[in-house]
Swiss-Prot record:
Its EC number is 1.14.-.-. It is an enzyme of class 1 (oxidoreductase). It comes from the Bacteria. It comes from Bacillus mycoides (strain KBAB4) (Bacillus weihenstephanensis). The lineage of its organism: Bacteria, Bacillati, Bacillota, Bacilli, Bacillales. The active site is at 181 (cysteine persulfide intermediate). Keywords: Oxidoreductase, tRNA processing. Residues 127-221 form the Rhodanese domain. It catalyses: uridine(34) in tRNA + AH2 + O2 = 5-hydroxyuridine(34) in tRNA + A + H2O. HAMAP family: TrhO. SMART domains: RHOD. One of its GO terms (biological process) is tRNA modification. This is tRNA uridine(34) hydroxylase. InterPro entries: Rhodanese-like_dom (IPR001763), Rhodanese-like_dom_sf (IPR036873), Rhodanese_C (IPR022111), TrhO (IPR020936), TRHO_N (IPR040503).
Length: 319
């Protein structure tokens, strides 16, 4: 493959035993900094989950070091080309679990997990009858892009998913269940939990949406919108054949794929909105957030009280 861009973004995870996550995190942070990588890596006794960016040479050194560590034998890196770093800083943090499911009786994906489907098999499975496609991500991730026909669970975070499944048991019983997430790590646990709950036909997209979008055969087909990623890029394309925008401007309902955080720091909700809507509504998701004394948009643009009042008046008048 011809090298066209100077940077690489690595996305990876592995369920493996790490004896002392705190000590490992400290040492790993120093190692990443020595390579001048930037990113966010989570470490737990159950394994590692990371995204980091650097030059081709820096990321190659990192991949080599990880492959040479027996704990990470067989780890798979999903690699994107980039023009620059995808992060501002480098963080390696110890956690109690890699993905926040907070089950009383935790799932070990090395012992129980759903069937792995490669992109082509997942593509075929999505078209079968009696199949339910469950998006295992957060609501704002779904709103930016998802597989055609996928169910959006009425939840705000991953840890609410088991309760939602239990509440919708009648709809799901007896169906073939397909589940997917960004890179695969959430589905490893979630699909295992579904199996433990008694669902017999549970499959997961191996390698997640990112792998599906790069597959030369399916080329991201049946995906609408873009894939939300947790770095400075915010979104990456998936469907190589056609681009359908499913995101909608929070204020106008117009097609939109531009995410911003609500300007109220106490809210910080992710909202899809155009630059025009952002200015018109002071980058705030509600009236309460617009008039919040710490509204970051007002501070950033040094708006006077008169300017803010005029903006609020226009909104009130529906202009």
């Amino acid at each position: 493959m011809a090298t066209t861009k100077p940077y690489r973004v690595l996305l990876y995870y592995m369920y493996t035993t790490i004896e002392n996550p705190e000590e490992f995190a400290e040492q790993h942070l120093e190692f990443c900094k020595s390579l001048e990588l930037k990113g966010r890596i989570l470490v737990a006794t159950e394994g590692i989950n990371g995204t980091c960016s650097g030059t081709v040479e820096q990321t190659e050194k990192y991949v080599e070091a990880m492959n040479n560590d027996p704990r990470f034998a067989g780890i798979v890196f999903k690699i994107d080309e980039a023009d620059e770093h995808a992060f501002k800083k480098m963080h390696v943090r110890p956690r109690s679990e890699l993905v926040t499911l907070r089950l009383e009786d935790d799932i070990n994906p090395k012992e129980i997990t759903g069937k792995y489907l490669e992109p082509k098999d997942f593509y075929e499975a999505m078209k079968q009858e009696d199949t339910v496609i469950i998006d295992a991500r957060n609501d704002y991730e779904f709103d930016l892009g998802h597989f055609k026909g996928a169910i959006k669970p009425d939840i705000e975070s991953f840890r609410e998913l088991p309760d939602w499944i239990r509440e919708n048991k009648e709809t799901l019983e007896g169906k073939k269940i397909l589940t997917y997430c960004t890179g695969g790590i959430r589905c490893e646990k979630f699909s295992g939990w579904l199996v433990r709950e008694g669902y017999e036909d549970v499959s997961q997209l191996h390698g997640g949406i990112v792998t599906y979008g790069k597959d030369p055969e399916v080329q991201g087909e049946l995906w609408d919108g873009q894939c939300y990623v947790f770095d400075e890029r915010i979104a990456v394309p998936v469907n190589q054949k056609e681009h359908v925008i499913v995101g909608k401007d929070h204020f106008t309902g117009e097609p939109c794929e531009r995410y911003v955080n609500c300007a109220n720091p106490e809210c910080n909700k992710k909202i899809l909105c155009s630059e025009e809507s952002e200015a018109k509504h002071l980058r705030a998701c509600s009236h309460e957030c617009r008039v919040h004394p710490r509204n970051r948009y007002i501070v950033q643009h040094e708006l006077t009280e008169e300017q803010v009042a005029a903006t609020l008046e226009k909104i009130e008048a529906g202009k």
